[in-house]
UniProtKB/Swiss-Prot annotation:
One Gene Ontology term, aspect cellular component: plasma membrane
A Pfam family this chain is assigned to: Virul_fac_BrkB
Phylogenetic placement of the source organism: Bacteria, Pseudomonadati, Pseudomonadota, Gammaproteobacteria, Lysobacterales
Superkingdom classification of source: Bacteria
Subcellular location: Cell inner membrane
Protein name in the entry: UPF0761 membrane protein XAC0937
Length: 422
């Protein structure tokens, strides 16, 4: 109840709501989701056959699930694929029947296309969540394999469990049959919702809270249902596409369907990442534009203090300690510090100093992080604490010599040039 009351109070706070709306819109634009969805749709089409091989190969390894292969295929194509594109199901079935005829080079190409698709998906989600560092390659492969195998087994087991439950005498009555029919109608949306929540939580190299993944998945499911309804309406009332494409009409329909599905999923992901990244900052707690170096120096001070105590800092802890940092700025700073090998990440996901700050000159930070040294004085958040005083003093030493140099007129630079034109 306290959490619910807290969310109600936040919604009543007009300034917070407007700030979040602007933040969300900027994230939508910055993520370039429509371009990312187009790229993923293209690679997904090429990964359909290898994905089917892996899925049905996993089911074939467990005789108990063999009888559910056809049922799982029919459930997917009947509920998630437009009717005009279901001829693809026959193509996939023929490909699986001819699996033994594939050469080694062909199998390598299929597996490579699947790995490329999965890698592209992970990169896209990492970009949406502003992840500073991707997973190691071995860890990435293990996650891919776990998602594919366990996801397939859970899907088949869920269908077997549902069939067993709906075969009970309770569901043979009129009321029970109505309830079973309602459950089967609701099942596709429930499957979509659960799968998208799991994708948001597992795929990005970022801790995604359930309270953020749920609204994002809900938005994605609503958009996918709207797309599904729109496809059904168009395909049921307009047959122009069949006259234009003829026997090939299934391919553009499938490609457009995959594209719009990815748009829905990525828009939901952008909402989830925005909810986790958004930090409402009162005016007094915002870093002035161009003063990112102040935040960087404070951040390094926090890591120096944590190192004394033998600790690391996770991203939530950093944002709690430094409320003037936005999630985007924090990720950018962490990425740059990792790139110059000043920070590293341990197996728990915490960030640690990788080098002694006593041997790191300020020039290295200035050159590599490419942050400006602001000349003007501006009110800085948390300037009176120990970290603020140290960072402000260093900043003052950096900009003091620049003030007199930059105060001279530009014309004075050319007073000693020869008078005759070249």
């Amino acid at each position: 109840m306290n959490k619910l009351h807290q969310w109600k109070e936040r919604l009543r706070d007009r300034a917070r709501t407007v700030s979040f709306g602007r933040f969300l819109w900027r994230r939508f634009l910055d993520d370039r989701l429509f371009q990312a969805a187009a790229s993923l749709a293209y690679t997904t089409v090429f990964a359909l056959v290898p994905l089917a091989i892996v899925v049905f190969g996993v089911l074939s390894a467990f005789p108990a699930f063999n009888e559910w292969k056809d049922a799982l295929t029919d459930f997917i194509f009947n509920n998630f694929v437009p009717g005009a594109a279901r001829s693809v199901q026959n193509y996939l079935n023929r490909s699986l029947e001819d699996l033994g005829k594939f050469t080694v080079a062909g199998m390598v190409a299929l597996v490579a296309s699947l790995l490329i698709t999965l890698h592209s998906i992970e990169q896209t989600f990492n970009s949406i969540w502003r992840v500073a560092a991707a997973r190691p390659k071995v860890t990435r492969f293990l996650i891919y394999w776990t998602v594919l195998t366990l996801g397939t087994m859970l899907a088949a087991a869920s269908m077997a469990m549902a069939a067993y439950v709906f075969a009970l005498p309770l569901f043979r009555t009129t009321e029970g049959q109505w309830l079973a029919e309602f459950a089967w109608r609701l099942a596709p949306m429930a499957v979509e919702f659960v799968c998208i929540v799991l994708i948001y939580r597992v795929v990005p190299q970022h801790v995604v809270r359930l309270r953020h993944a749920l609204p994002g998945a809900l938005l994605a499911v609503i958009l996918m249902e709207i797309v599904k309804w729109g496809f059904g309406f168009y395909l049921g009332n307009f047959q122009t596409y069949q006259r234009i494409y003829g026997a090939l009409s299934a391919l553009p329909i499938l490609l457009l369907w995959i594209y719009l599905s990815w748009v829905s999923v990525l828009l939901g992901a952008s909402l989830a990442s925005s909810m986790s990244a958004f930090r409402y900052q009162p005016e007094a707690m915002r870093l002035p534009p161009g003063f990112e170096i102040y935040g960087l120096l404070r951040l390094l001070g926090r890591f120096s203090q944590a190192r004394v105590h033998g600790d690391g800092l996770d991203e939530d802890r950093i944002l709690a300690l430094e409320p003037m940092l936005t999630d985007t700025l924090m990720q950018e700073l962490l990425c740059e510090l990792k790139r110059i090998r000043l920070l590293r990440r341990d197996e728990r996901g915490q960030w640690l100093l990788a080098r002694d700050l006593d041997v790191v000159p300020l020039a290295e930070l200035y050159e590599n992080c490419q942050l400006r040294v602001p000349i003007e004085d501006r009110p800085l958040p948390c300037r009176d604490d120990a970290f603020g005083q140290a960072a402000a003093a260093a900043l003052e030493q950096l900009r003091q010599p620049l003030r007199s140099v930059l105060a001279q007129p530009v014309g004075d630079l050319y007073t000693h040039l020869p008078g005759d034109p070249p």
